[in-house]
């Protein structure tokens, strides 16, 4: 873990705690563990939610298996990320931001992201690769959800830039999704 807020060392949604305000300069996480309960998983930031704000200049996460840049089990607000790079191992799933208890949750049960700004997000996985996963991406007041560039690539699974039921965003750059063997989607949303 780079930053973990919770009652124990496990990635347990029921024990996760809230981030009220967090500012990160550079966060660099790499897992090389090949066995154990998490089997080489690398989460950059893990918490229940962000209540006030989270800012980061650079987040780099490399997992021996799965890798996640920011995992918020219930969602969060006012996230500002300048640059985030996430890469997973040959059979691992990779995600930039997850707003859900787990990566396998249906999007209908995921949490909400509100007022986010991401300048550059790069995600690559051996299996599935996802830039942002949330039930909804919404804005409040005069704030806007501004997405710069998202690049997502997968060797052996789905590649999805943004996966959400509802998304209210301004795309300032481009979303590039590619998969060597399966489907690739820029934005996958129900509404």
State where each predicted segment sits.
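Surface-exposed loop/turn motifs in large extracellular/passenger domains
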Residues: 1-67, 71-191
